[in-house]
A protein has these predicted regions:
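An alpha-helical, amphipathic repeat domain used for nucleic-acid recognition
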Residues: 2-190
Length: 190
């Protein structure tokens, strides 16, 4: 048997696709409740998640709408409540400015009127300059020593949703030189 070679069985590496699961209204509802149990979501977010599950089904869109109506009726899904909670959280915990919260809620598919009401309620009594300073403290950003650091502070505050007038007011109080402020204003279109 010295010259005999053993051949190993060849295993096919074909991928076996699992048959797509079909969802009825109850199964889709359970999926949506599970998703909402993990975290709050907007109507647009939950629709996107459910549509991915029923895309191959001809009645998929109808099922999604029926489940959304059911979730709204049971008060599991409420964009106004979501927007209020989200705005308050981003302001109080992350110290983000008004513009950042508006942008984030738009991305999440919340209606503009709901966004306006929620953000106005959360930021109505807020001193934006003070909030921007709290954001900088939270991010451990100190008074800039040169142009590069001033630009870094400026960009961080813009990303956090603060108006450029508020940012320039802070930089001026920090005695950042006029040349640097002028350069930043030029770059900001202000």
């Amino acid at each position: 048997m010295a010259g005999a070679t053993a051949t190993a069985p060849i295993i096919s590496l074909m991928s076996f696709k699992r048959a797509a699961k079909t969802y009825d209204e109850e199964a889709l509802y359970e999926y949506a409740v599970g998703a909402l149990g993990r975290r709050m979501r907007t109507v647009a977010e939950i629709k996107r998640l459910m549509r991915a599950r029923v895309a191959a089904q001809p009645e998929g869109e109808l099922l999604v709408e029926m489940v959304v109506m059911r979730l709204k009726a049971q008060k599991y899904l409420n964009d106004a409540g979501y927007a209020e909670s989200y705005s308050r959280f981003r302001k109080e915990n992350e110290k983000f400015g008004r513009m950042r919260v508006v942008q984030d809620l738009k991305i999440k598919g919340v209606h503009p009127e709901i966004i306006d009401k929620a953000v106005h309620a959360a930021y109505d009594d807020v001193n934006e300059e003070q909030l921007a300073r709290e954001f900088l403290r939270r991010k451990r950003m100190a008074k800039p020593a040169d142009q590069k650091q001033a630009a870094r502070v400026f960009r961080a505050l813009v990303r956090a949703g603060f108006a450029s007038r508020v940012i320039f007011r802070i930089l001026k109080k920090w005695d950042v030189d006029e040349e640097t402020i002028g350069m930043l204003e030029e770059g900001a279109g202000g």
